Amino acid sequence: MLKADGVFQGGGVKATAFTGAICRLEKEGMMWQRLAGTSAGAIIAAFLAVGYRGKEIKKIMCDLDYEKVGNITAIKKFPLAKKSLGLILEKGIFSTVYIEKYLEEMFKNKGKTKFKHISLNGQSPLKIIASDVTNKRLLILPDDIKKYGMDPMELEISKAVTMSISIPFFFTPVKLKYMGKEAYIVDGGITSNYPIWIFDVKDVPRWPTFGFKLGNGGDDFNRTIENKDFISYIVDVVETTIDSYDESYLRDKDKIRTISIPALGVKTTEFNISLETKEKLYKEGYEKADEF
């Protein structure tokens, strides 16, 4: 039996690749001790934390109706005024209601909906990264929810994950109110898209930390350049910021504990990818874990 902590990078729909890597490691008897993730990586980490296995997570990710999550192709057909109104009034184009309810149902199937259900002595083995853009700070959930007058153990896992996946401008942010003030919580990728550091200690660790990261492998440069409206441009800028944030800070010691998986040129918000592409991402993840 192998023991390790697992950290998953954000990456939107590309995170399907992680399920392939997980399945390969499970064949070796991997037992996850602590888990952490940002954005879509937070979804994967949360599913593992409540007891799902790799094959189950793959099915859940494939069954998710991504058209209800955010149809970027359809939004391009909307009048600019309609898209702009969503940004002005709600601070985002798409609602996170569907994805939050979907996650809640999946966690409920395992009987573990709150952090207290997966914690021991008030210590959660799951850490979710989010960003408070109002107060300009990184959040590690559930711990940092105390800053908003809430009990970390009573926090819904689905709510924490929803905070982490709320890509600025694309999704409406989660609003937290405390002492008469309101804070907007968005995608953790703004502050740390690959929190490989989160379980590091000064002394020798009890077990290793393995990171799961997505790389483009240059495929994005082969994409057809098309005319973009202003809203699509904003989404692209945010995606670029999130995808590249931690890249320049990845140290050599982090690279050797990271399974880097090609993303096949798939974009973070490309929710309409085919089942065939999802299978290719899964295969890439499986093969890269096999080489690790």
Model-derived segments and spans:
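Patatin-like phospholipase
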Residues: M1-T38, A46-F292
